[in-house]
């Protein structure tokens, strides 16, 4: 009987003695904080604590937002400066206090003026009480100075004048006209901070370094990784030297991801948000030292300034003159606006 032919035994699989090359990935950059102050608009009413009413929006939030964007703060300061230039100082009210009063009104939609008395009970001067910390009292003609909740001080009844920008929802506090443009101011600020953080981080890589060259060992990869990570931060624009003997032409590839300009749309965001802010403040771009887009010249700036003063500043002067009715005498006076400095 013939012997059965056994199957030829298969050789055992060889055990891998060395691990193959591994893919390695690491990231650049750090989380970027994004400012969002929508909480200043979350108040629904003027809440009373028994002594004073809280404002319908956060005055602290409005104060922080003042410098959120160039096209938000600059129009306010332009209006303040023009008004201050036409104000005629009075023994009771200095130029400085008037400027503070106007700035408070433009930023917060509220401005407070306090009577200061002599020892004989006569009014000797008027001082601006910062609107950020001044509150309307529950009792009539009573106002409170509240720099902190634990240190409130009541003003003498009838000693504080309150100028407010009327609101359609309540009559206790005013609201600034620019509230609808605050989201544009915050967007403008967020875009600027994102771009600034981008450059400070030095995370400008925007590419994938794809290494397939077999001659690279682990030490080479680690050294390359460390040098690239060290290139972040200040002085990050550095040259990187890499020596790869017997390397292939395509052993190391740089694959760009995309330009950051197309990712965050920085310039379009800045332009759109700036236009919103200028529309909200209703101030010509030329009066802030800028030039409108797609316009060859600034036009007749003198005519622009006169129209702006007639439509915006004269109504503000009339509002501020309400102080005279409260005092019973003419303390607030203005001279005519003129571009001719020889007439000052």
Swiss-Prot record:
Localization per Swiss-Prot or TrEMBL: Virion
Pfam families, alphabetized: Phage_portal
Keyword vocabulary terms for this entry: Capsid protein, Viral capsid assembly, Viral contractile tail ejection system, Viral genome ejection through host cell envelope, Viral genome packaging, Viral penetration into host cytoplasm, Viral release from host cell, Virion, Virus entry into host cell
InterPro entries: PBSX_Proteobac, Phage/GTA_portal, Phage_portal_PBSX
Domain of life: Viruses
One of the GO BP terms on file: symbiont genome ejection through host cell envelope, contractile tail mechanism
Entry GO CC: viral capsid
Major localization listed first in the record, in broad terms: virion
Family membership noted in the UniProt record: Belongs to the phage portal family. PBSX subfamily.
Function: Forms the portal vertex of the capsid. This portal plays critical roles in head assembly, genome packaging, neck/tail attachment, and genome ejection. The portal protein multimerizes as a single ring-shaped homododecamer arranged around a central channel. Binds to the terminase subunits to form the packaging machine.
Subunit structure: Homododecamer.
NCBIfam families xrefs: portal_PBSX (TIGR01540)
Identification of the protein by name: Probable portal protein
Gene: Q
